[in-house]
From Swiss-Prot:
Active site (catalytic residues): 476
Transit peptide: 1-32
Gene from which this protein is expressed: FTSH2
Transmembrane segments: 155-175
Binding of ATP, residues: 254-261
Pfam families, A to Z: AAA (PF00004), AAA_lid_3 (PF17862), FtsH_ext (PF06480), Peptidase_M41 (PF01434)
Major location category of this protein: plastid
Protein name: ATP-dependent zinc metalloprotease FTSH 2, chloroplastic
EC number(s) recorded for this UniProt protein: 3.4.24.-
Compartment list: Plastid, Chloroplast thylakoid membrane
GO biological process: proteolysis
Length: 676
């Protein structure tokens, strides 16, 4: 018996889906000239020839050096210095030739191992000492010193050996540079390592997104602003004649799934001018300075194709308020933002470029980015109302088949808080269910199951009869009774024992309209209704038998009561806003930096006021359960038998035992009631 669904101020936030993309942006193919191909071929042939000559010449040079050594009498046989002294003492040395300043000696000596034949050996000397020279003179041995002689081949060999690696390195870098700049792959091709600073924006000279303003519904005000921008691009003389200038930027602000990107696709398809699109996260890379370089490159290309439109999706990835990052003023993201600010409205200006950006976190954007001159217009794209939801359902339902019992107006009334993406997902889920069940059209049953699945989760296995099922039934009926009998509460739409997600049972409440202003009576009534499940458990089964099933209910009503005290000023403390604006921000850093402006005494008063509201609401819930015990038993009996009761069925049974408040009465024919 998990949290009960109670549709408080609005529906619980839903996982949103992105509208299907309408096409892939085409990338222009760069074709190099034949002359450039010939030049590159010549360079490659020259490099191959040079490397080939080097490969052939190295063995030749090595052979030449070996021959030169042999001419100088350098033997491959070696003799140790101690053995040389031994041969010298035994008068076996005949001749000594000294090389390299007396450190190398080529010795002609008589070798007993070779039958007293003369052998030429090489001896490494520790140095030409006077004692050794004196000894050579005493033995009357012929010795001579030779200077180092190098021919031109040896000089060339040493020169090539010293310059080979630098030349190969420089040549490789040169080839990489030519490939990156000469069209051999472009920014995403094989030459890309040197193209990090290039913009990754998708460019379309004649955008073909497949989306027009006719495909956008439910956001009429935002659509009107964009239609003016398109009109300005197509017929600028109508506006310049009265001194108007084209807006430099339009910022789309709204929750996820409300159609911000869809509006950008529509303006791209309607404007008829070059269109650049990029995500804010594509500016920042792992290398320092890449983000600012990409911003410069993007606006350089935009100026070359002006007038044009630049669309930056999720601009909060790069436009976050400065000074809140870990890196401080040297943060790479801040450098990118500074360059973006300069390009949008700096000394040079960007005449003819309209920047359109979208975000769902406008509260964390830098104030310099939001000022007029950069983003002249801020268009709010909010969750649609009943009329907007109806228009959106008509757009997404145009290619689907519905049974005669399905009304798009009824679906719109049953889905408060749904965004455009949620409604598109709803109809798609209903179509999938209809196909799975072998139907040729979508019925109200598929619509009902799809709404339940989106809001509460997958349908689980129904519980077998027993104490747990009875406890869940009393818990859910307690919610329904307390909500229906408390003035100002939303009407019951459905009570069910079919598990969904983590909930063992569900009670659905649905507002009769879309309330933009909620009164204190309505908020307090929702707290009473939320505590009805725990009150029913305590009255029916006793205080020791209350369960953890009300954990989600308690979390919701505690948060609502705290909002009444801290945010809305609906308590005995007075009409104060007791929450720092920074603490309400969606940014974690800004919440950490927010100053706690309340004293310990005030914090204690807030806790007392929240507890007073909860206790008062719980006493009312207990009283309503005690007073309507007979009605509760009857409703639970029917619910255990049918497992699901519609709002009309529930109110019909309850009205037999007690009178429903006038403001909570719902006509039986209301569109909010579900088919049984």
């Amino acid at each position: 018996m998990a949290p009960t669904s109670m549709s408080l101020a609005a529906k619980t936030p839903l996982p949103f889906s992105t509208l299907p993309s309408s096409g892939v942006a085409q990338r222009p193919v760069s074709v190099t000239a034949s002359l450039e191909h010939k030049t590159n071929d010549a360079r490659r042939k020259f490099l191959k020839l040079a490397l080939g000559n080097l490969g052939v010449g190295l063995p030749t040079l090595l052979g030449a050096k070996r021959a030169l050594a042999e001419e100088q009498g350098v033997s491959s046989s070696r003799m140790s210095y101690s053995r040389f002294l031994e041969y010298l003492d035994k008068d076996r040395v005949k001749k000594v030739d000294l090389f390299e300043n007396g450190t190398i000696a080529i010795v002609e000596a008589i070798s007993p191992e070779l039958g007293n034949r003369v052998q030429r050996v090489r001896v490494q000397l520790p140095g030409l000492s006077q004692e050794l020279l004196q000894k050579l003179r005493e033995k009357n041995i012929d010795f001579a010193a030779h200077s180092n002689q190098e021919d031109s081949g040896s000089l060339l060999f040493n020169l090539i050996g010293n310059l080979a690696f630098p030349l190969i390195l420089i040549g490789g870098l040169f080839l990489l540079s030519r490939r990156a700049q000469g069209g051999l792959g472009g920014p995403n091709g094989p030459g890309f390592p040197l193209g990090f600073g290039q913009s990754r924006a998708k460019f379309q000279m004649e955008p073909n997104t497949g989306v027009t303003f006719d495909d956008v519904a439910g956001v009429d005000e935002a659509k009107q602003d964009f239609m003016e921008v398109v009109e300005f691009l197509k017929k600028p003389e109508r506006f310049t004649a009265v001194g108007a200038r084209i807006p430099k930027g339009v910022l789309l602000v709204g929750p996820p799934g409300t159609g911000k990107t869809l509006l950008a696709k529509a303006i791209a398809g309607e404007a008829g001018v070059p269109f650049f699109s990029i995500s804010g996260s594509e500016f920042v890379e792992m290398f320092v300075g890449v983000g600012a370089s990409r911003v410069r490159d993007l606006f350089k290309k935009a100026k070359e194709n002006a007038p044009c439109i630049v669309f930056v999706d999720e601009i909060d990835a790069v436009g976050r308020q400065r000074g809140t990052g870990i890196g401080g003023g040297n943060d790479e993201r801040e450098q990118t933002l500074n360059q973006l600010l300069t390009e949008m409205d700096g000394f040079e200006g960007n005449t003819g470029i309209i920047v359109i950006a979208a975000t769902n976190r406008a509260d964390i954007l830098d104030s310099a980015l939001l000022r007029p001159g950069r983003f002249d217009r801020q268009v709010s794209v909010d969750v649609p109302d009943v009329r907007g939801r109806t228009e959106i359902l008509k757009v997404h339902g145009s290619n689907k088949k519905f049974d005669t019992d399905v009304s798009l107006e009824v679906i719109a009334m049953r889905t408060p808080g749904f965004s455009g993406a949620d409604l598109a997902n709803l109809l798609n889920e209903a179509a999938i269910l209809a196909g799975r069940r072998g139907r040729t059209a979508i019925s109200s049953k598929e619509i009902d199951d799809s709404i339940d699945r989106i809001v509460a989760g997958m349908e689980g296995t129904v519980m077998t009869d027993g104490k747990s099922k009875s406890l869940v039934a009393y818990h859910e009926v307690g919610h329904a009774i307390c909500g229906t009998l408390t003035p100002g509460h939303d009407p019951v739409q459905k009570v069910t024992l079919i598990p969904r997600g983590q909930a063992r049972g569900l009670t659905w409440f649905i507002p009769m309209d879309d309330p933009t202003l909620i009164s204190r009576q309505q908020l307090f009534a929702r707290i009473v209704g939320g505590l009805g499940g725990r009150a029913a458990e305590e009255i029916i089964f006793g205080e020791p038998e209350v369960t953890t099933g009300a954990a989600g209910d308690l979390q919701q009503i505690t948060g609502l009561a705290k909002q009444m005290v801290v945010t809305f000023g609906m308590s005995d403390i007075g009409p104060w806003s007791l929450m720092d604006s920074g603490a309400q921000s969606g940014d974690v850093i800004m919440r950490m930096m927010a100053r706690n402006s309340m004293s310990e005494k005030l914090a204690e008063d807030i806790d007392t006021a929240v507890k007073r509201l909860s206790d008062e609401a719980y006493e009312i819930a207990l009283s309503q359960i005690r007073s309507n015990r007979e009605a509760m038993d009857k409703i639970v009996e029917v619910l255990l038998e049918k497992e699901t009761l519609s709002g009309d069925e529930f109110r019909a049974i309850l009205s037999e035992f007690t009178e429903i408040p006038v403001e909570n009465r719902v006509p039986p024919a209301t569109p909010a009631a579900l088919p049984a």
